[in-house]
Amino acid sequence: MFIRHTFLVPALFALLAAMPAHAEAPKPASTPAAATASDKPYGEWKKTLKETEKLAGFFNVYRKRENLYVEIKPAQLKMPFLSIVSCARGIGQNGLLGGLPIDDRTLQFERVGDHVLLVQVNERFTTPKGTPIDAARDLSIGNSVLASLKIESEQDSTHALLVDLAPVLVSDITDLGEAMHAALGKSVRLDNSRSALGKAKNFPDNTELEALLTWTPSDRTGLDVSAVPDERFIPITVHYSFSKLPEVPMAPRYADDRVGYFLSAQKDFSRDEKDSFFMRYIHRWRLEKRDPSAAMSEPVKPIVYYVDKTVPEKFRPWVKEAIEKWQVAFEGAGFKNAIIAKDAPGDSTFDPEDVRYSTIRWITSSEPVFGAIGPSRIDPRTGEILDADILFEASMFQSYRNLYRRITTAQELEEGALPQLKIQRDWAHASERNAAGMTARCDLATAASDAGALLGMTLKMDGTLPPGSPVPDEYLHPAVVWAVMHEVGHTLGLRHNFRSSTSTPAPKLQDVAWTTEHGLYSSVMEYPTPNISYDRAKQGQYWTSGAGTYDKWAIRFGYAPSGAAAADQDVAFATRIADESLQPGHEYSTDEDTYPADAPDPRSNIFDLGDDPLGYAKGRTDYLAKLWRDDRFESRVVGDTGDLTALKRAMDTLVLQYGQAAGMAVKYLGGSYISRVHKGQPGEVDPVVPVAAARQREALDFLSQKVWAADAFNASPKLLQRLSPEHWSHWGTPNPFGVRADYALHDRALVLQAAMLRASLAPALLTRMREAESRSADSYRVAEHFDRLTKALWGEVGGLPTALKPLEGTSTRREIQRVYVDQLANMITSPMPGTPDDARGLARLQLQRIDGRCARTLLVPTLGDNTRAHLLEARARVKRALEAGSQVETAPLR
């Protein structure tokens, strides 16, 4: 929080001016020799705590009905501690799920007179204590006061203070109401009359408190909270965890942008001789060698994960196997037995809420939005990971084994095929406060369920798996191991690596010996797709089998001891490891390199495999279309008896994944290869290299043939008549009213076609093309791009009459042509911010050319009614756009 003291000066002078000119100085108050009990400003300690239940621990807590007294010892005043707030029990839908984090801060208690302030410590800025720059910081930057608590009692002998924390806990101090507004689409109000304190637990290093909050929506029209018995009263249990910070901070390791770690950042204004005031520390566990002189040593304290009793028996050995598969990476950092998996003790000595234990647990939700989540407790001063508790959604693996996608809305299909659209929308609504949470989001459920659905279909089409059967354990086991390794990787500090799939040469994908050594992808932090061989006689590993080349390198960067006595020496040590970033298998990119609309690198994707994403897109789309066009599709997926709605969901799964694969081609258009490279490192390359013009043309040709062509999504009429809708009508199922009974393949195809067309005309993409024109004579130019798009979408119009057959026979082609005309028209009349001026001119030119094509074709006397009506309508749209564009451009200045 910034406190701008310059704003206080006028108010101070105004106050002084209002004082009497000859005001007398106040006389000192007399001090009595001894205060009687009745003179004490606070209640007596024993009397205040009468009938309370004491829970001894980090902060001693005393519980009495609606009061929750916290004892603050003198040493605990101005002692920073971690506060992590999470949703202990949600409603199982709308993203309001148990286990999800809400807020984390560093807090401290400060006494001011008869009150104790609950203060959020500003950890963003730091300076060496006692220096002039430290004094300057104190004048400019302060802390935030979250609450002022009346002192209820003070112990005579220890001077410990009692405050009632209940009013803080049973409140909206974390701004949860705003988050619920975003989740539900309705504003909500905390109903204090229906809210209360929940359970409380205490441990030596942490205090755990809960509040049972009830929220009342302002308007229930259209509100969907079917998992709540009474939608007027929405219950959310909020969990507060206060924990101790290490007395001796860990020596931090500075981050390097070439290796993917979560980090904590602080500004140190004393670093005026450095290139930045920022200090960035990676998140890592405190691993110290028991024998510092040994090349390989056991740690003083290993990283231990306890597998909780909530994990089903069958999964426990797989979970422990996955945890300990990280050991090979730590061996590369000089540690043996650095990471250990244990079954959670079954006695009262163990509690997963005790910060001394890191756990893996299973949870269940009515409508899960994540497959797993791995929140960690971080010391913001150093980046030290103090504790981690991984939650797996039980239905994720059920989805992997049994379920296909159910697509109910155009937005769901569009964002499923082009995930960056959803991420962009979420980022747009993310405040600065929760932006860090956006970089840490993990959509593991989507990766796992879609992968399982496709693998199951493949095995059924092979005849390996009987129709209607779930994916068997021999295929589920490696998927579970990957998923657990992925989530454990997050709690070791690692971010996603969406470049790792391109580290494997495509010809090596089915080479089991190669993929066992290097990984099917170089990092388990990837979102992979099953490695399905299109030559079914030569099938390799479906899933990677352990830590990959990147994982081993990243762990070495983060955890290998440097033995350095000074921070600069440790930086030099870590930099030498990071300098290996251009070696094969060390490629790295993460969420912000992959999801944004202006993310330019076609190699940074999710759900791809191999070093040629465009080649992958070609092969995967051919394979998916082959599946739904196979005459055996129904019999192999459903069998002779069974639920035909499963066939519809299977078709939805294939169409969605077709869109995911095809969408990778869009990134080649106006794309650039981005390398995280530092000056002078071995093998140094240019950090930004435009994609070759020939490759961009190849990508557009692919989109033209496999997305925008009239027959791109063709399926047999017989199959479409067999795709049965669901006929259930109760809570937890889609509302059947207003839902089409037939399978709208046309609409689904148009959603994907239009999304990729819009992405191909995005301002950032066109701007990059324009910039590339000045860098190379052999560039893919904006003018060529528009011309090729027009030919791809309107090529049959204006030519030979025999080419018009697709236009007359199906509305799909006519619809995407209208979308293209509308996109060009919008570029003239209401261009998106950032659209290059050249693009507006070229849009006008292409509209004129489309008008000419339509005019020539309308002279053909044998045109069908559909085609003639379509061309006349297109000309009318073009005319309106050109006239409106002229009016906009010639409008006088005001």
Stretches found by the model and what they are:
Residues 315-322, 476, 480, 484, ...:
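Stable alpha-helical elements in mature extracytoplasmic
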Residues 9-18:
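Bacterial N-terminal signal peptides
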Residues 470-475, 500-894:
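Conserved catalytic/binding loops enriched for acidic/polar residues
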Residues 19-23:
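Sec/Tat signal peptide C-region and signal peptidase I cleavage site
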Residues 343-364, 369, 478-534:
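The catalytic-center signature of Zn2+-dependent metalloproteases
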Residues 324-335, 365, 490, 494, ...:
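Sec-exported extracytoplasmic/periplasmic mature domains
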Residues 1-9:
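Bacterial N-terminal signal peptides that target proteins for export
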Residues 24-68, 73-311, 329, 333, ...:
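Auxiliary tRNA-acceptor-end handling modules of aminoacyl-tRNA synthetases
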